[in-house]
From Swiss-Prot:
The gene is bamA. It holds the Pfam family Omp85. This is Outer membrane protein assembly factor BamA. Part of the outer membrane protein assembly complex, which is involved in assembly and insertion of beta-barrel proteins into the outer membrane. Constitutes, with BamD, the core component of the assembly machinery. Residues 24-91, 92-172, 175-263, 266-344, 347-421 form the POTRA domain. Belongs to the BamA family. One of its GO terms (biological process) is Gram-negative-bacterium-type cell outer membrane assembly. It is found in: Cell outer membrane. Residues 1-20 form the signal peptide. Keywords: Cell outer membrane, Membrane, Repeat, Signal, Transmembrane, Transmembrane beta strand.
Amino acid sequence: MAMKKLLIASLLFGSAAAYGADGFVVQDIHFEGLQRVAVGAALLNMPVRVGDTVSDEDIGRTIHALFATGNFEDVRVLRDGNTLIVQVKERPTIASITFSGNKSVKDDMLKQNLEASHVRVGEALDRTMLSNIERGLEDFYYSVGKYNASVKAVVTPLPRNRVDLKLVFAEGVSAKIQQINIVGNKSFSSDELLNRFQLRDDVPWWNLTADQKYQKQKLTGDLEALRSFYLDRGYARFNIDSTQVSLTPDKKGIYVTINMTEGDQYKISGIDLNGNMAGYQSEITKLAAIEPGSLYNGTQVTKMENDIKNLLGRYGYAYPRVMTQPEINDQDKTVKLHVNIDAGNRFYVRKIRFSGNDTTKDSVLRREMRQMERAWLGSDLVELGKERLNRLGYFETVDVETQRIPGSPDQVDVVYKVKERNTGSLNFGVGFGTESGVSFQIGAQQDNWLGTGNAVGINASKNDYSTYAELSFTDPYFTINGVSLGGRVFYNDFRADDAELSGYTNQSYGISGFLGFPINENNSLNFGLNYIHNSLSDMLPQVAMWRYLRSMGEKPDLESKAEFKADDFALTMGWTYNNLDRGFFPTSGVKSTLNGKVTIPGSDNEFYKVTLDTSAYYPINDDRTWVILGRSRLGYGDGLGGKELPFYENFYAGGSSTVRGFRSNNIGPKAIYLYKDGSPKKESPSRDAVGGNAMAVASLELITPTPFLDSKYSNSVRTSFFIDSGTVWDTDWNDSAVMKSKGIPDYSKPGNIRVSAGIALQWMSPLGPLVFSYAKPIKDYEGDRSEQFQFNIGKTW
């Protein structure tokens, strides 16, 4: 660089004598050294043209202009008579860019960083820019505590003035915090304050969020947490005076010293509201009701400001300014809050637009909107629209933004940006157990048929004990007011004996329909009617089965298999509460569904059934990557008019949807087969499950970030650790002396609770939804069958 400057300077001085004070007229311009850059492109960048009279100043500007293009490492301008000779040395072209040794920084991030600095394949190499990139990357490593890190750019020359660029990283190890000292704290111990830090010099095994590795960003967050801790407890004059970060000589250890001044505690003396409140002073006054005499609380003040902004936002004032200036009285230790409010203009919505919905029709999204066009902008309605789109389950992500209209002082467009996920599936299920072997299921489901929002499903299963087919349809907006219409038809040929359930065969078919009515944003009711035909055969003499047949007026023969047919009409009713944040992989909210079914006159059976299903998600960190999920299912059914609940309507538990680790439907009462004289067989109880008329299932899950997986995939992959529990019982069971003498359990008691624990992985893969679980029974009973590993695989479409 020094030689280049010297050459240019000498050239300019030397040319003064050659060109003369009046310069000369350029008759031709000749380039030497051009390879990649075209002559025409170089001429366009020069301020001098053929026919111009040039001077020393013009030559200097020419050299500067050519350097400014970034294409040349060296430029020299010479004169040969009336011809300008421009000698250049082009910068080499980057042929490839590779990285080596980078673990903390992904290749994609590095490429984006280089792109921003105009370092890319096919561009000229600027060595000065490389030096800046090296320093910038090293500064990044220093900020995350890797003080031994180094970054070197290795440039390898290639033919035709090309180079390979390789960034070589030596990341080293992260410096660990040896000690954090807090100086100046009087009211609270250092341990109490450090418990609120992410950075720690000693991390307990149970603390999943703390970290001993130094990061500048985390220290900044910890200092802010320390400041908030004191401000929330009345210390209005609290101040962090200084922070020192010291390295050990080997650069592997960090000592942090925080010097602070606590000050005294201050109380609120009053609140003064000022400014343009757009006529909502009474509502704002209620939001600013901080009790005089209470300790000053910074978080409470911030919440008050946000509440005022949200209130004004609901009434169309999209960009209000709310600033609180505390007036501190050091003499009586009080703070008066002066809240300055400027509501600004009221904004109206010009258009609501959608992007990213390549399959889903605009009308499907638009019907979920509660914000109307040409109405004033309501921030709560805009956010509600986002929640409702998320709840559909059609999209991986939903984002919304308001865009101001250029030239308009009071108009905005509301733009929802969605990323669609595959809502259709051609799937098959696979289960494996040490005793059950392998089973299969196949089906097709499209929750967003042709982008209309309608759900269409065709499901079928074929295995050793069942042939099942079902066709279902749901239109969630049968009417413009959101009344839904749905129905299904099905056929089932079920051989329970082959499924290791109580021995019988049931050929059934039916049809059902329902109407759903929205009550408000989170509640809905549905009413339906169904018809089911059941044709039972091959019924072996068994206590629960014979008890049901006798209640129906039948007199089954203990010496032969029984047959029975029933046609039933039933009224169904349901209530659903749903405030989940999204329909797929929720992270917060509750969904509860209460369903009931009762037979109506004209039916052979007389019974009712009620079920309550609840799922509740509670995020435990701000990013919602750690979530607690609680699930439960309660069910009860019984006969009416002296009849019993049909045994084929019993509840069952066990399997991937209830208690994982146990074989499907295996938990609960077992079949008690009878001899010809009506006494229980000596091998009773059998291992065949018969279910019961009552059920309780509960599950607790900890949803965690998936190890070794980038956070950007959190919307498509979910990992959880779980504990499942459940039981099924028969409230009509007669625990007689005969049963006791045979050692048969009392199936009328709900206390035989099964428990399992395990891990689950759900993945919405490009090939379809995959669900894996591995669970081990913790508490089981004689006759239970385990199925520790279960998974389902599907293909989306």
